[in-house]
């Protein structure tokens, strides 16, 4: 697909290439992507159904897990329908405002997911380090407040990215986005203007969210491990640590994929563009796909209720 050199004033429609360099095989790439999406939808919907129907799971940890499942459904659904439209039906066009909205949803939902992982780490910290006070500290009201703060933090931090693009840029070098979805820097690079402010703010948001969340989760688990290793009985240590395994797995895969995608994009100039696009797409789809599988396999209560549901 050729890219026009004509400067465009306030374009109403943009074009998503998909995966640059792999246009001829995108229809085949769409098959595993669609399978991952369907499994993610089924797994997270099942998780939400179990948590909602079982009163014994109406605890902070599982409420946060339900929030994570809902976020995963929203995140996967914000990119896959359009991506499959590009891969299978050759519908690359997207309205400019719709593209900005998709960008805002994607980055906001990523921020929400990171915030939920912080909330889950805090819950595990209180449950293990202060078990007798857990029920008094993590009240239903506090859970609602934490959930609201997580959503508002992400939405408010990402909103200026949208405003800066809409208000600062009027002329664009091209209307063709070399990506499979509307990502912040992919849109910013189209502008025929100084994009330094947008780049700086984008990095500020990324490092603010990731920096705070990673620090908080790491400190929480340092305290958790200190408390666990001080327990006198081996069985008690194993039981306490076992309640954290699922969260640790989800936390590691979320941030490892995020950092791998970030550093290959920023510093992997020798890497082919289609590798960048593939990894950035996989980074958004793999967590929604893996999270319900990890919690289903590692959390006894969830596993029991899944078996009970299918047996009945």
Swiss-Prot record:
Main location as per UniProt: membrane
**Which residues are sugar-modified?**
5
List the record's Gene Ontology CC terms alphabetically: plasma membrane
Q: Which residues lie on this side of the membrane: Cytoplasmic?
A: 49-56, 123-141, 221-240, 298-312
Topologically, how does it sit relative to the membrane? Answer: Multi-pass membrane protein
Question: From the record, what ranges are coiled-coil?
Answer: none
Task: Show the InterPro entries listed in the entry.
Answer: GPCR_Rhodpsn, GPCR_Rhodpsn_7TM, Olfact_rcpt, OR51/52/56-like
- Disulfide connectivity for this sequence is 99-182
Q: Where are the transmembrane segments?
A: 28-48, 57-77, 102-122, 142-162, 200-220, 241-261, 277-297
Q: Which family does it belong to?
A: Belongs to the G-protein coupled receptor 1 family.
- Which UniProt keywords are present, listed alphabetically? Cell membrane, Disulfide bond, G-protein coupled receptor, Glycoprotein, Membrane, Olfaction, Receptor, Sensory transduction, Transducer, Transmembrane, Transmembrane helix
Single GO term (MF):
G protein-coupled receptor activity
Keyword Calcium recorded: no
| Record's protein name | Olfactory receptor 52A1
Query: According to its UniProt record, where is this protein located?
Result: Cell membrane
- Enumerate the PROSITE patterns for this protein: G_PROTEIN_RECEP_F1_1 (PS00237), G_PROTEIN_RECEP_F1_2 (PS50262)
The protein's matches in PANTHER family, at most eight in alphabetical order, are given as: OLFACTORY RECEPTOR 52A1, OLFACTORY RECEPTOR 56B1-RELATED
In the record, biological process GO terms are:
sensory perception of smell; signal transduction
Q: Which domain of life is it from?
A: Eukaryota
**Which intervals lie on the Extracellular side per UniProt?**
1-27, 78-101, 163-199, 262-276
- Relate the protein's function as given in its record: Odorant receptor.
């Amino acid at each position: 697909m050729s890219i026009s050199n004509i400067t465009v004033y306030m374009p109403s429609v943009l074009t998503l290439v998909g995966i640059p360099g792999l246009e001829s095989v995108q229809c085949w790439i769409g098959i595993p992507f669609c399978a991952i999406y369907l499994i993610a939808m089924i797994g997270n919907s099942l998780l939400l159904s179990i948590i909602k129907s079982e009163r014994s799971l109406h605890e902070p940890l599982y409420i946060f897990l339900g929030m994570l499942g809902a976020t995963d459904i929203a995140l996967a659904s914000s990119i896959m329908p359009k991506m499959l439209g590009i891969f299978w039906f050759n519908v690359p066009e997207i309205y400019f405002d719709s593209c900005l909205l998709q960008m805002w949803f994607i980055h906001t939902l990523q921020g929400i997911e990171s915030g939920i992982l912080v909330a889950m780490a805090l819950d595990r910290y209180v449950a293990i380090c202060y078990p007798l006070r857990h029920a008094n500290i993590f009240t239903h009201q506090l859970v609602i407040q934490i959930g609201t703060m997580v959503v508002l933090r992400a939405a408010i931090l990402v909103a200026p990215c949208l405003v800066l693009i809409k208000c600062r840029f009027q002329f664009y070098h091209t209307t063709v986005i070399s990506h499979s979805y509307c990502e912040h820097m992919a849109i910013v690079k189209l502008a025929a203007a100084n994009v330094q402010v947008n780049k700086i703010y984008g990095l500020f948001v990324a490092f603010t969210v990731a920096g705070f969340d990673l620090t908080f989760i790491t400190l929480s688990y340092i305290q958790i491990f200190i408390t666990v290793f001080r327990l006198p009985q081996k069985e008690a240590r194993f039981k306490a640590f076992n309640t954290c395994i699922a969260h640790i797995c989800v936390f590691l895969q979320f941030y490892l994929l995020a950092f791998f995608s970030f550093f290959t994009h920023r510093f992997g100039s020798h890497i082919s563009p289609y590798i960048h696009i593939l990894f950035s797409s996989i980074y958004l789809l793999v967590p929604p796909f893996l999270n319900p599988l990890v919690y289903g396999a590692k959390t006894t209560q969830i596993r029991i209720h899944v078996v009970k549901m299918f047996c009945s």
